[in-house]
Amino acid sequence: MSIDIDWERATSGPDGELLAERIRSFIHDKFQQMVLPRFIRSVQVTSFNFGTIPPELEIRDLTDPFPDFYEDGDEDLSVSSEEQSPMREQADRYRERIDSWQTNSPGSLEGQMSGRMGFGHPLQLAPDEDGSRLHPLRSPINLGDINPYLFPRSGTPGIPGGTSNLGYFMPLSGLSGSQVPLRAVTRGNPFSGGWPDSPLENEKRIGHGQGPPRRRSEVDVDAIQSRPSTANTGNTLLSRGSVSTGDPRHSHPSQTLLANNPGQVPDANDSPVSAVPPLSGTPPRRMREQKAEDFQVFCRTKYAGNISLSLTAEILLDYPMPSFVGLPLKLNITGLTFDAVAVLAYIRRRIHFCFLSPEDADALIGPETGAGGGDTMEPNSLRRKNLSLLRKIRVESEIGRKENGKQALKNVGKVEKFVLEQVRRIFEEEFVYPSFWTFLV
């Protein structure tokens, strides 16, 4: 089914001019972030115009929106209370559980001592005895971490208080063989390498240093995200990533201690941290609730119009010396040919818009058919995968000043090639799925 668009009404007037200015400013900002070649000093986008020729639109399918469109980002802070989804409530309960666990568990040395001694106020410790500043001593020999409290002042007959300073000063040569039993070194005693930090320090790190772990979907998934391939996905696109519930970074402190000490038997009088049940995995992504009125349209979009984009730059000449002189450049894009599948999803006062890559479009709505009914190109061919959505771009370039009605230089191929490659890259990175734009209506 074809759709007729009142192109003049949509692109003219104050609203059309404002939209054109926003597009010009957006492309200009992207060029400012690029690394320019050595022979180009700067690029400025001066104007943008929609032209007078409208695109051709043909509706190909009507489906449910992509799951990614339901993801609730950090910028959606004005969502009403009725749009709170069950998955968001589950994530909120998860964070409340972490906060409650950190509040009730003794996370510092002061909290433990004040709780055991029964004082109403926490015990004030000297700076040298502060739990946050107390670190295990390190030996030059790889004996692991040695806690100074393991070596109190030993008693000497006839001298009250003893004379040993081993608890305060560690000899540079480490411990002698008579002081470190061989069995202790081989069985993972605190003197051996790889001995974990004390449970007290682990609790302090958890209570004050780390806080609740960040969601996997916000950090790990986005860091390794690449455009999903949908060659064999049927009618749905691949999800952006999965959350692993067995991530060792999110394991419980008590489980980590027991794992490092297989022979240790948990004591009933241990810290309440060991009695807290492990948290069940990581919270899911924030997703808005799906409703029956949500819909998504696949639309074949063809355009061969006179859209225009004007850019100015300065080209540097290296003769007779590097960057000897700069020539002004004016580059005009006077039209382009475009063919792609657009996705338009409506979800409760939000419109999500993007284009599909050629292979994604073939997987979802089938390959494009020609006038004779056959496929215009093999769906999985290498040529189609490398085909850009911007099929053809018409460019006019003027370099140098006019002298006697003639240009000093014309149509420098390197400059045109660079600008066209950057225009294609901006379009594909910003408008092709999984990238999409959201508009509030």
Swiss-Prot record:
<comment type="subunit">
    <text>Component of the ER-mitochondria encounter structure (ERMES) or MDM complex, composed of MMM1, MDM10, MDM12 and MDM34. A MMM1 homodimer associates with one molecule of MDM12 on each side in a pairwise head-to-tail manner, and the SMP-LTD domains of MMM1 and MDM12 generate a continuous hydrophobic tunnel for phospholipid trafficking.</text>
</comment>
<keyword id="KW-0496">Mitochondrion</keyword>
<dbReference type="Pfam" id="PF10296">
    <property type="entry name" value="MMM1"/>
</dbReference>
<dbReference type="GO" id="GO:0032865">
    <property type="term" value="C:ERMES complex"/>
</dbReference>
<feature type="compositionally biased region" description="Polar residues">
    <location>
        <begin position="226"/>
        <end position="245"/>
    </location>
</feature>
<feature type="domain" description="SMP-LTD">
    <location>
        <begin position="1"/>
        <end position="441"/>
    </location>
</feature>
<dbReference type="GO" id="GO:0005789">
    <property type="term" value="C:endoplasmic reticulum membrane"/>
</dbReference>
<keyword id="KW-0446">Lipid-binding</keyword>
<dbReference type="InterPro" id="IPR031468">
    <property type="entry name" value="SMP_LBD"/>
</dbReference>
<dbReference type="GO" id="GO:0008289">
    <property type="term" value="F:lipid binding"/>
</dbReference>
<dbReference type="GO" id="GO:1990456">
    <property type="term" value="P:mitochondrion-endoplasmic reticulum membrane tethering"/>
</dbReference>
<dbReference type="GO" id="GO:0000002">
    <property type="term" value="P:mitochondrial genome maintenance"/>
</dbReference>
<comment type="function">
    <text>Component of the ERMES/MDM complex, which serves as a molecular tether to connect the endoplasmic reticulum (ER) and mitochondria. Components of this complex are involved in the control of mitochondrial shape and protein biogenesis, and function in nonvesicular lipid trafficking between the ER and mitochondria. MDM12 is required for the interaction of the ER-resident membrane protein MMM1 and the outer mitochondrial membrane-resident beta-barrel protein MDM10.</text>
</comment>
<keyword id="KW-0445">Lipid transport</keyword>
<feature type="region of interest" description="Disordered">
    <location>
        <begin position="183"/>
        <end position="289"/>
    </location>
</feature>
<feature type="compositionally biased region" description="Polar residues">
    <location>
        <begin position="253"/>
        <end position="263"/>
    </location>
</feature>
<keyword id="KW-0472">Membrane</keyword>
<dbReference type="GO" id="GO:0045040">
    <property type="term" value="P:protein insertion into mitochondrial outer membrane"/>
</dbReference>
<feature type="region of interest" description="Disordered">
    <location>
        <begin position="68"/>
        <end position="89"/>
    </location>
</feature>
<dbReference type="InterPro" id="IPR019411">
    <property type="entry name" value="MMM1_dom"/>
</dbReference>
<dbReference type="InterPro" id="IPR027532">
    <property type="entry name" value="Mdm12"/>
</dbReference>
<protein>
    <recommendedName>
        <fullName>Mitochondrial distribution and morphology protein 12</fullName>
    </recommendedName>
</protein>
<keyword id="KW-0256">Endoplasmic reticulum</keyword>
<dbReference type="GO" id="GO:0015914">
    <property type="term" value="P:phospholipid transport"/>
</dbReference>
<keyword id="KW-1000">Mitochondrion outer membrane</keyword>
<comment type="similarity">
    <text>Belongs to the MDM12 family.</text>
</comment>
<keyword id="KW-0813">Transport</keyword>
